[in-house]
Design a protein with these regions (language model features):
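Hinge-like oligomerization/junction regions that interrupt long coiled-coil arms in large cytoskeletal
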Residues: 28-203
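Extended, EK/Q-rich alpha-helical coiled-coil segments that serve as long dimerization/scaffolding arms
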Residues: 1-44
Length: 203
């Protein structure tokens, strides 16, 4: 009788453990579904390829994906237009840990015919920052674009590579004046999003 009772106890215990596992699995699935739902909402306006990469990273199918550039930078409101203009399409570039991670993501996009995306591996991207000393005394100079936003230190190389050689001016007149003084060597963006390009063209 004791053996039979012990057997029943073990069966009940096993059934309880199985139920706990099933509950945990169900909770995990709900958690992942919620994460993907939030991700979808947060990626409104992004290209299909970028959304696909972020979804697969959320599912654990891609590793080393840090996120789109725009999600990794913190920009004060007063500089938002200027920095968005300076970044342009690069806002949707995807930062990854390594070249291997980039290759896997590119392969996935190609296999599923989901378009293209640009990947920025932390292991290879390095940036240089303009020397602002010559410009600091010029009327209308605001700063170097890379210094007007914040990010985790691990992304500073990415930030500097995209924004380190862009100056920000108060308005288009100031931008043109500074560009002339600096011999049109680099881009200058005004706070309202006008651009004096390297070489002298205006956008």
């Amino acid at each position: 009788y004791e053996l039979r009772l012990d057997g029943r106890r073990k069966k009940a215990q096993a059934a309880g453990e199985e139920l706990n596992r099933a509950t945990l699995d169900a909770n995990e699935q709900l958690r992942r579904a919620k994460l993907l739902e939030d991700l979808e909402r947060n990626l409104e306006g992004f290209a299909q390829s970028v959304k696909a990469v972020m979804k697969e990273a959320g599912r654990g199918m891609l590793t080393g994906v840090c996120g789109p550039v725009t999600k990794l930078l913190s920009v004060p409101r007063e500089y938002a237009v200027a920095l968005e203009t300076a970044l342009g399409a690069a806002m949707q570039n995807v930062v990854v840990e390594s070249e291997q991670d980039a290759k896997k993501a590119i392969s996935l996009l190609k296999q599923r015919d989901l378009g293209r995306a640009t990947f920025l591996p932390l292991t290879t991207i390095r940036g240089t920052v303009l020397d602002k000393r010559e410009m600091e005394e010029l009327p209308g100079f605001v700063g170097i674009a890379s210094e007007l936003c914040r990010c985790d230190p691990k992304y500073s190389g990415i930030r500097d590579s995209l924004l380190g050689r862009v100056a920000v001016a108060e308005d288009l007149d100031s931008a043109v004046s500074i560009a002339k003084r600096m011999k049109y060597r680099f881009r200058i963006v005004s706070l309202d999003g006008q651009v004096v390009n390297a070489g002298g063209s205006l956008t």
